[in-house]
Amino acid sequence: MTSSLLAASLIIALGQSPESVSTEPAEPAASFIQTRLSFLAGDTDFDAPDATTRFHVALDARTAELASGLHAEAAVSVFINPVAVSGAILQDNASFFGLRYRPSSWAPDERLALTVFPVSATRLYMGHENPVAWARISSLTRTGNDGEPALELRLSRRRWDAFVAAKLPSLQNGATQELERRLMLLVGAGVNLSPALRLEAGAANLDLGPGSRPYISGREGDIYTRGVSGRVMWRHGVPVGANVDLALYEGDPTFFERFFAPDVYPGGFGAHVALEGSYVSQQLFDSDSTEWGAMRKQAAHAAALVTRLKWDRLRLHALAYYRTPSFMVLANPGFPLESTLYEQMESLAELSATVGADYFLQDWGLTPGFLVRVTAPATLKSLVPMPMWPRSNPLIVRGTTSYSYLPEGAERSPILTAKATARWDLGEVAGVLAELFYTRDPNQTTFANDDTGVAVVVWDSQDIVGGNLLFQVRF
């Protein structure tokens, strides 16, 4: 468990519902204004000084009908991050404005939508289950200071939907060192084969431009990311809803709105089963080539299987996923940066399985739950070169920019997490989420000097206890 759990990953926004690929809310019947305030406090390790707090403000506005079938809407979504004693930094969270058009002959959930994201667009991405989603951010390697605006056009009909989107990140040209706008294209479609069965597919292409090393002139020197994602989903009975686990929604800009949306318990049985996969190819510098500036393609893979069941007020959920190390660092690729993995590296994918249950106590508005997760972390074995400091220690890849070494000759070990959760719905105006978890991570290490004064990797404490608290009000 790392401190990234409570970083910018946990975000609150309007967007994709858990049962659809759409990134937009339902069509409003009339004008609507809502303010949403959220406070998040957490400590991923009570024994370490890494406690964090965040405050989020969101204002959502939707107009009544402007013309026949035409509505407008906008959302301002901002984080207020504390700095020093009394300072704060504002961080945009995919604020947007747009138009929604629905002819009178269309069904209520059908529409043509145009959405503009003027600052950032983390709600536009590939994949579905959050641990295996990608393309939220184009690149962390050469990102500029001018944001990542985007434009999306989406058509939703009763049996199918499709979208096309363009992101325009400001990235540094590796050859000229100047900032320039690059283009990231995303397309996707979904079709309901029956009321229960749905198929979805999408693709993305991002040209990052010239790399930061000399290369032979021509387009073959550009660094790019291209990939496809697909999902098959089966649903039956009453809506199940999402499980209560912040750790599984790292980087998801819609989790908190989906989580605090009113859940329904009409009685009876409901099921949601989905299988998805992604294949991504990146053109990077060839780490093994003797030709300076040579390029090579590197593949990245991910897959996930999710099952959620509901019986009256009891919900059961399970999630298993697979991610290669190259997939986990798509936005910040390479060892070193923007380079392929060395051929002598043995790459072990991350494997994770989570099972849990919760029960809704209607008289209290309380939903207590418990879950268990086992994870084999992604690992790079053999030589892992670092600039000016080559090491042969196995490297644990924990996230896009989070790594840790194992002692030489050591093997990765499974990470066990047990977590108790509680969701408390206070009518339609407020909600509380509390988590308390225990993690046993045998891969925890630190650095210490040996007898000769040289820093070496040594084992650290395996046991971690932490917790999170989220409070949200709406008016």
Model-derived segments and their meaning:
Residues I415-G431, E435-T445, D450-A455, G466-F475:
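C-terminal functional modules
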Residues V116:
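Conserved, mostly hydrophobic/aromatic
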Residues A88-P103, A107-P108, N130, A135-I137, ...:
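Surface-exposed, well-ordered secondary-structure segments
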Residues V76-A94, T122, G127, S138, ...:
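Subset of outer-membrane beta-barrel
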Residues S17-F32, F46-R54, G69-H71, A107-A113, ...:
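Signature for the C-terminal beta-barrel architecture of outer-membrane proteins
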Residues M1-E27, F475:
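Cleavable N-terminal export/targeting peptides
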Residues F46-A51, E65-D109, N173-Q177:
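Surface-exposed loop and membrane-interface regions of Gram-negative outer-membrane beta-barrel proteins
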Residues V57-T63:
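Histidine-anchored nucleotide/phosphate-binding helix
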